[in-house]
């Protein structure tokens, strides 16, 4: 699975050849199909589930280590920004739903919801309920937070364009500034 995941990050779903993966791993194609009878689609669904579980565990650890809602969101942002600097092909895994069956699309949506959205939603809901965050719908706040982080991850990974301010060139700096923007807005 590691080799297939590496190829996914390099070539995208359509660019991955199972022959190349089996040759590199040193197994036969029938051996691969024994473990993944539905072939390429099932293999990459398993990789997506593994990556999402990794994200869920990382987010839950980051959240559990902090008492306040603001600190939890800072920890989430730092963890996600640092994970983006590793070789996890999350963009390609997110894109995977375009190429798989409807059943697998539903599975991926449910796994995304449980692994990324739910831990953050629980942290935000708790902060709203305790009065730390203003009265607002936690669902809206969760999607807004995820959207802002996702956008900043894209900016951080874009090779060209205007240079980022020095303070946001590290994962830590980008995380801090993004959460500050979410929590405090742009008004003075």
Feature-to-residue mapping (PLM):
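Hydrophobic/aromatic-rich alpha-helical bundle segments in the mid-to-C-terminal region
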Residues: 89-98, 106, 110, 125-180, ...
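Short, basic, alpha-helical segments at the C-terminal edge of helix-turn-helix-like DNA-binding modules
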Residues: 48-54
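Hydrophobic alpha-helical connector segments
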Residues: 46, 59-88, 139-145, 175
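Short coil/turn segments at alpha/beta junctions that flank glycine-rich nucleotide-binding fingerprints
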Residues: 10-14, 66, 87, 130-131
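Helix-loop "lid/cap" segments that line or gate small-molecule binding pockets
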Residues: 61-63, 78-85, 94-100, 182-186
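Short hydrophobic clusters on alpha-helical segments that form packing/core surfaces
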Residues: 3-8, 182
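Helix-turn-helix
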Residues: 7-42, 46
């Amino acid at each position: 699975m590691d080799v297939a995941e590496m190829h996914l990050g390099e070539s995208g779903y359509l660019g991955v050849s199972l022959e190349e993966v089996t040759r590199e791993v040193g197994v036969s194609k029938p051996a691969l199909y024994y473990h993944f009878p539905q072939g390429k689609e099932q293999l990459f669904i398993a990789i997506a589930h593994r990556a999402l579980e990794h994200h869920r565990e990382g987010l839950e650890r980051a959240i559990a280590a902090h008492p306040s809602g603001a600190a939890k969101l800072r920890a989430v942002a730092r963890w996600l920004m640092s994970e983006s600097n590793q070789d996890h092909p999350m963009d390609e895994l997110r894109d995977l739903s375009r190429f798989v069956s409807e059943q697998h699309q539903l599975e991926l949506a449910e796994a995304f919801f449980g692994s990324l959205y739910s831990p953050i939603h629980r942290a935000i809901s708790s902060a709203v309920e305790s009065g730390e965050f203003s009265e607002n719908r936690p669902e809206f706040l969760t999607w807004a937070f995820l959207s802002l982080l996702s956008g900043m991850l894209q900016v951080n990974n874009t090779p060209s364009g205007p240079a980022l301010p020095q303070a946001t060139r590290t994962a830590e700096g980008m995380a801090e500034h993004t959460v500050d923007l979410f929590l405090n807005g742009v008004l003075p």
